[in-house]
């Protein structure tokens, strides 16, 4: 650990924060606004552990693991480009810290199966990803693996979208049950609901790699325009002369994220009076998105010229994460009579 990092650690006193992202494809605007911007701010005030959740990727993409390694490298480049600092935050790959799997295994000894079956996303993802066989032990148990990810570092806070709050509540229940059996080893973390976490995709559903409706952080200006100009809008605006209502328009959500108050007011007035069409309405929003992505992409290009940068970041992150994980697992093994 560098002197600068040690000083930074000592100046941050708001508790440990843990979060991760699955390397199942290119990061997109949903990740940027729903997680990454928040992570960049959190690292200023908290000890942060951000990890590439490659084992979690296998819970749904087990039949096609070929992209995990390259997606991991791309994800680290994106993280660095948006402002995550490896001298401040611990950036690592889940599978390189085997204590995640060990703690998951030990938790599986004490957690009732119905606790996992009642997690809302268990049924929701099975419905949404019907082309995949998700009747696996790994998929059923992935919320418990999330609990292990969080509790391994004794996180105080977990930044999540509102739809992920049940996972945090499960983690709190896991901590309580373990502590009741074996003594006070784990704190109960709290969920931090991230504003702007739900970014709509081009089809109006939540932006997701799985749905093919995402604007990637690496999309150039032309690709951003092509995707967003086709984004669905208020269904009442079938013709240019039909008035609409921004509250029923998925594209307006991006105006709320990216545009100024005056720009939103002009768009709202134009939509409700049909004085502007949907294509014209989107122009200013598209330009704002392009303006935000341009410097991120430039920083990313600079990072790609630094040979071995992702490997260096992950190696240092693994070292720091492993030190904490080993300490926690020493306590766990002792509490469970495994020493």
Regions found by a protein language model. Give the residues of each.
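N-terminal Rossmann-like or analogous alpha/beta NTP/dinucleotide-binding catalytic cores
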Residues: 2-148, 297, 301
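A generic structural motif
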Residues: 23, 158-159, 213
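A generic secondary-structure signal for well-formed alpha-helical elements
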Residues: 76, 83, 111-115, 155, ...
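Conserved nucleotide- and phosphate/pyrophosphate-binding catalytic cores
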Residues: 29-31, 166, 172-339
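Short helix-capping/linker segments at secondary-structure and domain boundaries
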Residues: 113-117, 152-159, 259-267, 297
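Classical nucleotidyltransferase
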Residues: 102-104, 118-127, 131-181, 185-203, ...
